[in-house]
Amino acid sequence: MATTNDLKNGMTLDIDGVLWNVVGFQHVKPGKGGAFVRTTLKNVLTGKVVDRTFNAGVKVDVATVDRREMTYLYRDGADFVFMDSESYDQIPIPPDVVGGTADYMLENTVATVALHDGAPLYVELPASVELTISQTDPGVQGDRSTGGTKPATLETGATINVPLFITSGEKVKVDTRDGRYLGRVTS
């Protein structure tokens, strides 16, 4: 148990049996009336984001979430198999838990897996990863009708927009949070 005054970004709360991550919070002390805390919460399972207001000092349940470093090994049917870096246990994780991070995972990718009561909640990759462009159309000199970008397919199968000068076979850095091209990787 903690109070709303102890909230921090990244905390996981158990509200009515549903797990929520604190994305943002603000303590508000109006001139009239009691203080309160405005929070932005993200549902751990569905990803839905809601705004919720708590009175200051109200007790909230903080869920115990174990964050472990794991290595993605392979796909087994629909499941993704991860290996715990400490215990070397192999854990199958369903695709709905892995979510959109699968677009940026290759074998032997190190990720952080959040577990609650031994069950995986979500998989978190580093902020950026380096991947190879498997297919993209050649950029035509002077073609600026598309804003200077073109679609490219990564080695994982995901599609991102890259600048016109990028060619197939090049390594690029990609933001795993929104799928943006960050830059070319130089050897």
Swiss-Prot record:
Entry-linked InterPro entries: Elong-fact-P_C, NA-bd_OB-fold, Rib_uL2_dom2, Transl_elong_fac_P/YeiP, Transl_elong_KOW-like, Transl_elong_P/YeiP_cen, Transl_elong_P/YeiP_CS, Transl_elongation_fac_P
Main location: cytoplasm
SUPFAM superfamilies: Nucleic acid-binding proteins (SSF50249), Translation proteins SH3-like domain (SSF50104)
GO molecular function, one term: translation elongation factor activity
One GO location term (cellular component): cytoplasm
Recorded family membership: Belongs to the elongation factor P family.
Functional summary from the UniProt entry: Involved in peptide bond synthesis. Stimulates efficient translation and peptide-bond synthesis on native or reconstituted 70S ribosomes in vitro. Probably functions indirectly by altering the affinity of the ribosome for aminoacyl-tRNA, thus increasing their reactivity as acceptors for peptidyl transferase.
Domain of life: Bacteria
Protein name: Elongation factor P
Subcellular location: Cytoplasm
GO BP term, example: peptide biosynthetic process
Gene: efp
Keywords attached to this entry: Cytoplasm, Elongation factor, Protein biosynthesis
Pathway it works in: Protein biosynthesis; polypeptide chain elongation
Keyword Metal-binding: no
